[in-house]
Amino acid sequence: MSKRINFNDVQPNAYEAMEALDKFVDETSIDKLYREIIKIRASQINGCAYCVDSHSHDAMRLGASMQKVLLISAWREARNIFSDEERLLLRMTEEITLIHQHGLGEETYQKAIEVFGEGKTAQIIMAIIAINAWNRIGVATELRPPHRRKELAPH
């Protein structure tokens, strides 16, 4: 297996553009933990192990329980673990990430407008688009998560 490119080294302008999109998302009114939940779910769907690892740790640092992080992929079956807003965010994330299936459905979109308003819904859509782009970079360049054995060891 050959070593893949590092975008920051090879195409710094492209990397800077991605960082600018991240800066926009970071400055939105979306709750920080909600942003991490979006990032984890999209990364799971896209198979980006690096991003799943990174954002799972970020979510726990923000106060998410390990149980919540572990159940993100099974959020429908773990409805009692996630708030109504979190379930809506997860549904939006899946529909936008799997855009080739049906896209963001009208029912989901209208519920988002009702719950979050137009401005925040636009911010959420951009947050989902951003992590999907990062996931594609991560998968295409074969980014791998670091070993975190000490961090994950039971206490």
State where each predicted segment sits:
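Hydrophobic alpha-helical segments
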Residues: 1-155
